[in-house]
Amino acid sequence: MPKILFIEGVSGVGKSTLVRRLTERLRGQGYSVKSWVEFDFTNPIDFYCTAVVSSEEYEDLCSRYPASLETLRQYTVFADDIKLVRYYNEDTPLFEQPLLSELWDREFCYEPKNPVPLSEYARIYQAVWRQYFSTLGQETDYLIFDGSLLHHPINDMMRNYHADKEQILCHIRQLLGTLGSQERTIYYLRTDDIAAQLARAHTDRRQNPTSAKEVEFWRQRYENDQFVLQWVDENFQIVDVSNKGWNNALEMILADLV
């Protein structure tokens, strides 16, 4: 069975770059690797620009948009009674208007207009994770996820539900419970100066300068992350990437794995 690696940390610490480099190095050593970075719409356990629809709503969409029926089915995640429809591939829409807007109105977690209740959000997440991890084969050595365990779920819970630390911890524990005895490790990238790291990341990405409110959000996110790691009872490593220490971080993770 594959070993599962969760690469975590607040925004701007270099998670996606490290996932790409780690994937390349492991493949170079002969390992079979599947990995997903942020905004990869093929990620089986993460959701960005994904609509949640009931069975009745899904049937209605299929009926009203017969020309898009094949595409709808292609980009739908089915789990229990749940239908999740991915409608963007990064900046590229997967559907035309007006169907695209209808799906956007049903966004599941990324700045949703009408968030589902927190209990339903957790149930949907767990159902998708349980289905995916219960059907893993033997053909892959490593599965590497960029921010799928802590980064995106905790962002959702803080921004959309104003969840407290105990609620966040409960959700993450339940997600990890869907993995059963599957071997996994959390590698958490940390930096001594969150504000400075965010500023560098925004400059590199040609984004607007960070605001004081944004810095405060990520400091609170970091505190929530540390609370979860302290109490979640999982195998994790804190990896220091202060002072551009990504090369050392990569070598440390590789040494830990192989």
Provide a role label for each language-model segment:
Residues 145-148, 165-203:
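Conserved phosphate-donor/acceptor-positioning beta-strand/loop module used by diverse small-molecule
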Residues 16:
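Walker A/P-loop
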Residues 13:
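ATP-binding Walker
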Residues 203-207, 213-258:
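NTP-dependent small-molecule kinase module
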Residues 69-176:
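Glycine-rich phosphate-binding loop used to anchor ATP phosphates in small-molecule kinases
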Residues 24-75:
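Conserved substrate/cofactor phosphate-moiety recognition/catalytic segment
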Residues 10:
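P-loop (Walker A) phosphate-binding loop of NTP-binding proteins
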